[in-house]
Amino acid sequence: MIVRPQQHWIRLIFVWHGSVLSKIFSRLLLNFLLSIAVIIMLPWYTMLGIKFTLAPFSILGVAIAIFLGFRNNACYARYVEARHLWGQLMIASRSILREVKTTLPDERGIEDFVRLQIAFAHCLRMTLRRQPQTQVLGNYLDQEALQKVVASHSPANRILLLMGEWLAIRRRSGKLSDILFHSLNNRLNDMSSVLAGCERIANTPVPFAYTLILHRTVYLFCIMLPFALVVDLHYMTPFISVLISYTFIALDALAEELEDPFGTENNDLPLDAICNAIEIDLLQMNDERDIPAKRIPDKRYQLT
């Protein structure tokens, strides 16, 4: 995620870090070079009687803009839902620890429960990003639990099971009543709902055929555009063609980033920072001293 302070509109025009321009610059450069080639070839294909008009491109451009808008809205909805789910995880994590602390004030094993909660957040993050988990989870789980979690089809779900077992042991020993156990178990169900929601987004991409047809149409439009502009604009063709192409190609590239909100692109969710915030909150609630520093954006304003 890009976290920038409010800037003057003139400075925003020239922003590089955080924009998709760095990703699509080579494509715009190709469009610029193609436009120059079209200017050079103009006398030849005029002699052949080949003539393009802007009318079909105007109609096609409006259609592409509408469908790009639909796709971007769908991808942004995935992004918003993903952020909402991680917000729910923060609420559930704080709530269940608060209830455990107040119902079991003399419990000495709460540190283990806190580490299970932190491990769950990091495990979910690394699962969604398809990253190796053993090294990070080893900081929060004992060797036996770590082996069970890593060997599971759904490691995060296995950690939820370990948290449920921790509560069940206190219930069997009489430290938790059935009512309190049921309340705490509902919090675990909330965390399970977050897990399922994130898995649904991660495992259900925008239909490939829909993405493909838009991608093809956008690039064919941008390739043919200089031929339609050159008759009227001539030497201004490269500049106008690049400007129009930037609008369409940038929207297409932005939709690709937002489609998977759990990745590490510039405009994806800052899962590292969210997990860091959860860890800090839980450790402070448990009055621990060894607390990690809060993550801040890097020099390029990116927060991962």
From Swiss-Prot:
Highest taxon in the source lineage: Bacteria
Family recorded in the similarity comment: Belongs to the anion channel-forming bestrophin (TC 1.A.46) family.
Keyword flag Repeat: no
One Gene Ontology CC term in the entry: plasma membrane
Subcellular locations according to the entry: Cell membrane
UniProt keyword list: Cell membrane, Ion transport, Membrane, Transmembrane, Transmembrane helix, Transport
Alphabetized Pfam families for the sequence: Bestrophin
A GO molecular function held by the record: chloride channel activity
Primary location recorded for the protein, binned into one broad class: membrane
InterPro entries: Bestrophin-like, YneE/VCCN1/2-like
Keyword Membrane among UniProt keywords: yes
Name of the gene this protein is made from: yneE
Residue stretches spanning the membrane: 28-48, 50-70, 209-229, 235-255
Name of the protein in question: Voltage-dependent anion channel-forming protein YneE
Membrane topology: Multi-pass membrane protein
